[in-house]
Amino acid sequence: MTQMKRYTVDESSSSNLERALTLEWLDTNGLGSYASSTILSCNTRKYHGLLVANLRMPKGRYVLLSWLEDSVISGEKEFFLSCCQYPGVFFPREKHFLKEFSLDYSPRFTYEADGIRIHKAIMMIHNEDRVLIRYDVEHCQFPGALRLKPFVAFRGYHALTKENMFLQTETYKTERGFSLHPYDGMPPIVVQTNVEAKIFPSPVWYNNFEYEREKDRGFDWHEDLFCPGILEIPIEKGSTVIISASTDACREKLEEIWMTETARRANEALRDEKIAEKLENEEDRIHVRNLITSGRQFLVNSPSGRPAIIAGYHWFGDWGRDTLISFPGLTFLSGRSEEGMAILDSMSAYEKNGILPNYFSDDEMENAYNTVDTSLWYFWSIQQMLKYGGDIRFIKSRLWPVMKRILKGYMDGTAFNIYMGENGLLHAGDKDTHITWMDATVRGTPVTARWGYPVEINALWYNAICFVDELGQLFDDHEFSFQDLILKIRKSFVDTFWIEGEAYLGDVFRDGFLDQAVRPNQILAVSLPYSPLDTAKWVGVVEKVKKHLLTPVGLRTLSPEDKSYKGRYEGDGLTRDAAYHQGTVWPWLIAHFGEAYMKAAEDKAAAKTFLLNYIRTFLRNHMTEAGIGCISEIFDGDAPHRPNGCISQAWSAAGLIRLYMLLNDTPDT
């Protein structure tokens, strides 16, 4: 089966060590588990690993198989296909042999050295905690051997392993492999091959692996890993070797599993291609197809079986706000309407006192309800579902009761000092809370104090009230008719947030004072389906945001002219948190800027051209810049706008899919 190369990194980039160590790949299994590393197969993060499993028991993500030292022995020479960093040195010291990295149905590596040409591919198996690593020997002058050393960590993915006496070092023979049961209460790891291998048990700890990216982030960056032994497999020209690492022994042939998973991914690619066909421009079709393919990695079934969206890889879990902002682009616009409805239906069951969870726990902790806007994004997500073919009967029977409970809870007042004021606007929080999306704290204090009446919360509130009023009429539910309230909110919104002389919206109103910082939150007052602003005011908001906040990779969270602006997202955790929403760029906001830009534009054709060129340039430059084929979470506010945060963020990809589809539906004239 011929595989399509979506992205390629050639030798000119891979030969630059510093550059190559910033290029990362990711493969997922639909359960929240993943495999990930750099293109050099050198782990630079504690989150890297070949089998990072989202376990049911113990709950959470665990790095099981951290690294695989793989090498080819030919004659008297040993050629290493992977590398690692120890204090002051890389191993191996000699030049690496990566000729090309490509991402097609899965990450694929091509190595060349002294007459040897070998291909490696890595693939997680859908709905299994199993990774397959395949080696195809295209050319080998003499018969040789593939030598493999697996290194296990068996720890939570936020932690690091240190050598300890508790790890059980004994291995047990299985069919074409072995199993290791390192700790009581943890699953085993089972390593198997498709061909006979010589197994040499040689249990030993290797100390002081270094993870450079963790050092950059201000965390502990040294780890000890355990190697249970060595596998050696004879190879020659035409050989195919497949390694399986899993929590369960495999009874099927590994070749058949590989073929089945490849066929499944090929079918998914055809489906993605069909959706992208509706776009007129060939480059746009390629970008949308790749975004949809990338977006699929976020759709998971949690260990409890609940359909969910992972907010970002590597370290984010299942976040309510991110889910609701992401799911229209990742489901309804990506040919997965049933999955979208299942996610909404599942989330609805967790409403409590009008609030939907900010975070769904993947361990023993309770779900977190510390949010004001998740419930408001719920209304927007239902609007998007309805816009793109959702079933109104499903909304009435399953979602409408929840929508009414949310509004009632917010109107009457609920947790976190959330209530509707006499002016109809929505109040949220106090000085100790951080319940909007700008929620970073330093030493327990919110960095961006947004309690009171935040502008985007009230834009979302107005949108929700208008939408419920619309549905109330459609469903003949007269209890939820809000014509007078709509007029009151509309007037109060302008009176409270509009800065007449500057023609833009302030960010938050509190204690009689309007914070006039130029932030991107105001763009929602234009982009949402129901705007609380007269159309004449849209241009002012859009132009202010464009002038101060628009970058080639998204919107800054604060104007560079503000004294509190932080242009670089770097340093330890406290320093980074202080910059997270104080100038750092977020690409998820591109979609709302684009939507507002189109609504405000007098010349729709010119606006469409501007936005399409913007997206094309962004994707050309970024998709092989950090996470290959992925959209990063954030970027520096200052040029050259380095990517940072998670290498693959759900709402970043989802927003671009949605904006692409919006522009495609907009006539050129």
Range-by-range predicted roles:
Residues 209-218, 293-306, 347-357, 431-443, ...:
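Active-site-adjacent bridging/hinge elements
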Residues 226-231, 306-323, 362-375, 439, ...:
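Solvent-exposed loop and edge beta-strand segments that line ligand/cofactor-binding
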Residues 79-106, 113-117, 412, 543-553, ...:
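Non-catalytic C-terminal accessory modules of carbohydrate-active enzymes
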Residues 268-313, 342, 346, 560-564:
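Conserved oxyanion/phosphate-binding beta-strand-loop segments in alpha/beta enzyme cores
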Residues 358, 411, 415-423, 427, ...:
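Catalytic cores of carbohydrate-active enzymes
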Residues 1-280, 314, 321, 332, ...:
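Terminal accessory carbohydrate-recognition/targeting modules of carbohydrate-active enzymes
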Residues 257-275, 287-291, 335-349, 392-412, ...:
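Extended, well-ordered alpha-helical scaffold segments
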Residues 139-140, 161-164, 182, 235-237, ...:
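Aromatic-rich carbohydrate-recognition surfaces in CAZymes
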